[in-house]
Amino acid sequence: MSELNIFQAELENNEHCEAIRRLLNEYALEPLEGGTGLAPEVLSGLIPGLREQSSVLVLLASLEADIVGIAVCLWGVSTFAARPALNIHDLAVSGACRGRGIGTALIAEVERRAREKGCSRVTLEVRAENSNARSLYTRCGFEGAAHEVPAGVTLFCAKYL
């Protein structure tokens, strides 16, 4: 595999911002996510919205010069542990680059940063029918519980640190 690099996005860097919009739009185009992509107003408001949130962490994955993966995370607190927690809000890898360990590497970096901040856990949500993502999360040590939502069953998963 080409050299994989995981790094924190700089929300003032135009290349990073374009990659964030591109990867999240590609993710939204997936049939499991509705298949329609992000609306123009969402695409234009995405970066300003991320910049306004002090609790956001955006990690990008690059292979050589191409940015091919993203993890959008939100810092929070576990009230039951009285410690920080980190939620993976979005995790996506460009379709042509899947199956190459990029998602695993992004999750490992999320976990490393969570441990560094003393987090009690990393959490995420995944659609029950998204078997590829569920398999990845299970391999990475996440365990889940299901709940019904209008769009189907969503699993809330956590990895305790």
Residue ranges and their predicted role:
Residues 89-91, 140:
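Structural detector for helix-capping/boundary residues
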Residues 91-98:
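A short, internal acetyl-CoA/4′-phosphopantetheine-binding micro-motif in the GNAT/acyltransferase core
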Residues 76-78, 96, 129-131:
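Short coil/turn motifs at secondary-structure junctions
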Residues 3-10, 23, 118-161:
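C-terminal "cap" of GNAT-fold acetyltransferases
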Residues 84, 100, 117-120:
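Short coil/turn segments at alpha/beta junctions that flank glycine-rich nucleotide-binding fingerprints
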Residues 99-112, 135-139:
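Conserved acetyl-CoA-binding loop-helix of GNAT-fold acetyltransferases
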Residues 4-83, 89, 107, 113, ...:
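Acetyl-CoA-dependent GNAT
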Residues 94, 105-121:
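Conserved acyl-CoA
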